[in-house]
Amino acid sequence: MRMPLTPVGMVENQSAVVNQGDFLTQLSIISSTSPRLSAKYQSTYDKVTNWVLAGADVSQINRFGIGIQKMAGQDGYQNVLMTGYYSPVIHARRAPQGKYQHPIYAMPKYKRFSRAQIYAGALKGKGLELAYSDSMLDNFLLGVQGSGYIDFGENNLNYFAYAGQNGFPYTSVGRLLVEDGEIPKEKMSVQVIKDWAARNPSRLQGLLERNLSYVFFKNVPNGKVKGSAGIPLVPLASVASDRSLIPSGSVLLVEMPEIDDEGNWLGKHQLRLMVALDVGGAVKGQHFDLYQGIGDRAGHIAGLLKHYGRVWVLN
């Protein structure tokens, strides 16, 4: 049986680390927002920081007292699954008007309504409406991401943070579309779901209602995107991990697959330093969800990323 993590003496990739500044920014944010986590990993953070400030030459990493563990990968050959997530920006208004008719709700006192019941008006008129968007699907995807930004057309963005869930199990609509024969499994992505919805507007609500789970939000006007560790995230310097394997605060050297605008792997990787600061319901074992950032471009890449790379845990 292969061990999930194996101590090694070197990193087999000698490429340059491309995000040294962003990584140091992420460490600085950890230090200022979570003294507990910072103290737990202080020795590792200090050693890796010294290595980065000296140029982050991978061939010299051992000289800084940094221990290295290589992840086994999903297949035992170091192929760790990499997917992406992001913070969407939803265009909305504070009251229903014109095309803005799809409510985003705060957490109710009684939450045990299915998605279909909520769509049918179970929460209507209870003063829980935080915003009205122009897209039922965008609201749904906001729930999948767990947080995001709302653009009320007032020249600023309001952060909507996760407030809770209705208590029903989550069902992947992507999986449903594959099972229904609507989309081939190998073609599945968020963009493909959006394309399907654009072609089938009358069928969209019925599809979404098959996922009984519904997410509620709270408006944090000047809030920052935070992971489950409660720490603001720096794009492409933070990941969601399986905490049972990679605890929050762990430092990772990640081969991030480079993809084109259609999601095709370009045959090369970027070497990035990242910190595990979040979790995800689908993130299990040898799998990382890489935080891509805010807005449509980040969302486009996040929706297409489903490739493999090697990962080394530094300590």
Please place each PLM-identified region on the residue numbering:
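Solvent-exposed, well-ordered loop and adjacent helix/strand elements within mature globular domains
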Residues: M1-N315
